Design a protein with these regions (language model features):
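Membrane-interface extramembranous regions
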Residues: 1-148
Length: 148
């Protein structure tokens, strides 16, 4: 029974992780277009030079593009890498403005942002699970063998 469960989980783990991450990114990406003010508020407290709507819209568009790549399976290592960057950027708020996050006793904003650590780990797994693509020249070539 354990082997059956493990094998089933292995079959669905990759697609399930990619699609879940895509749904999360799409959702938060769309919300940045609906109301950018919560993100602008966080940026105002942490990185005021980025606290304007156009930057938030750019983040939202990036999240939507990455969500599309994750769902379609296109350029997975790069989609994962950009996702790691998005979540790493969010996590910098803990370092830059601990007063916003309440580190180490987390505020509500800190609790909300902490989930990005798990999402970043999921993005690293997307990179790790992406099929490796070697250039054709790097592949070993078959060597003809003479039969005597």
């Amino acid at each position: 029974m354990e082997l059956v469960l493990t094998n089933a989980a292995r079959r669905i783990a990759g697609p399930f992780l990619r699609i879940s991450l895509a749904v999360i990114l799409a959702w938060i990406g769309v919300l940045k277009f609906v109301d950018p003010s919560p993100v602008v508020g966080l940026l105002q407290a942490s990185m005021p030079f980025l606290a304007f709507n156009a930057f938030v819209y750019l983040l939202g568009a990036t999240e939507l593009v990455v969500a599309f790549l994750l769902i379609t399976g296109i350029a997975l290592p790069y989609a994962g890498l950009v996702t790691v960057g998005l979540f790493a950027g969010t996590l910098t708020i803990f370092v830059i403005t601990p007063s916003v996050t309440g580190f180490p006793v987390l505020s509500l904003a800190g609790q909300f942002l902490l989930k990005d650590l798990g999402l970043m780990a999921a993005a690293v797994n997307v990179i790790a699970m992406a099929p490796a693509r070697e250039p054709a020249l790097a592949r070993p070539q078959a060597v003809p063998v003479e039969v005597a």
